[in-house]
UniProtKB/Swiss-Prot annotation:
InterPro entries, per the entry: Huwentoxin-1 (IPR011696), Huwentoxin_CS1 (IPR013140)
Identification of the protein by name: Beta/kappa-theraphotoxin-Hlv1a
GO CC annotations on file: extracellular region
Lineage: Eukaryota, Metazoa, Ecdysozoa, Arthropoda, Chelicerata
UniProt keyword annotations, A-Z: Amidation, Disulfide bond, Ion channel impairing toxin, Knottin, Neurotoxin, Potassium channel impairing toxin, Secreted, Toxin, Voltage-gated potassium channel impairing toxin, Voltage-gated sodium channel impairing toxin
Modified residues annotated as Isoleucine amide in this record: 33
Location (main, coarse): secreted
Amino acid sequence: ACKGLFVTCTPGKDECCPNHVCSSKHKWCKYKI
């Protein structure tokens, strides 16, 4: 299962949902700009 918006993630390890990216600053999934 992919991680949704604002779900905690580890950059380069966890998979965020399509059109989302793991923020290395906040350590959560956010929308790609």
